[in-house]
Amino acid sequence: MAKLPILSSKDVIKVLNHLGFEPAPKRGKGSHSAFVKKTEDKTRLVIVPHRDEIPRGTLLSIIEQMGLTKVEFIKSLKECR
């Protein structure tokens, strides 16, 4: 099984943009950003904390919110770098 790298919020946001997620409407000031992707049957909402290093457990939760597996996420990360 692929081991998740330690990433910053900027790296995660690059992957989200690469996969077609868009910033959600502003919800005020805060330490997190929200991204949305609408598909035919679902609307996915992904919350990303602003951090220099996102813990692996938090990153795994973000990947699940995106609807991806770890392998799919790592592949997308390599594609957008």
Question: What is each residue range found by the language model?
Answer:
Residues 23-61:
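A short, structured beta-strand/loop element
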